[in-house]
Amino acid sequence: MGDFAAPSARLVAAARGLLALDQPDTNTVGMLRDAGVPLAPGTAQAFRDIVLATPGLDRAVNGILLDPATLHRVTGSGSTPALHRVRVPVGVRMGDENLRSFDVAGSVDGIVDDIARHRAAGASFARWRIVAMADTAVTELRARARLVAGWAASCVTGGLTPFVDVVAIPGARDGVHEAATAHGEAVRTVLDALRTEGVHLDEVVLGSSIVTPGRRASDVATAEDVARATLRGLRTAGAEDLAGV
């Protein structure tokens, strides 16, 4: 993997998106089974290795997201493709709504070493996902946002681009307007926490769920409705200040 002067810019330079290879083995095995691929022990690992060794991968995606185990296995094994041969930014999944030893006030004691290890292994960005359900209390969402903001600040200090993934899940009967409002508020809460923590938004890449009505909503949204509602929510939240979405 090359040394990218502006990894956040590289992640969003072309409209190719990120390739997520960080799913649990059970998810990968299920996908391969549905595709009719013969399964054996180690099939999921072999699938990831094949993808990483694909010629021209840098022309197809803007970045690759790995789970921590795969990142460090690929780095430490001579039988798998070295990350320096992958000519796209490689990221690592760090947050999955598991607070571990971190308190909800945003303390990230103990995670700095993880960031340093991932950086040394070849990662240039890291992702943390924050999920806002329809019934998530405002105080709880703010606490999660503070935690993510503290993590993002540590990433910037440690040389990783923070990729903050905000997923807003609407209520079952929410229409597209209600869903857009909830989505915008979730993104705004996270961005406000980042600013409060002193993180420059132009150093952050945002992942965002799209705005769709709840599964039991009475209204039907077209693809254009979904696109407009999603963009409206992002603009209202101030997402234009980010490195990219």
Give, region by region, the residue ranges found by the protein language model.
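Hydrophobic beta-strand scaffold residues
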Residues: V90, P162-F163
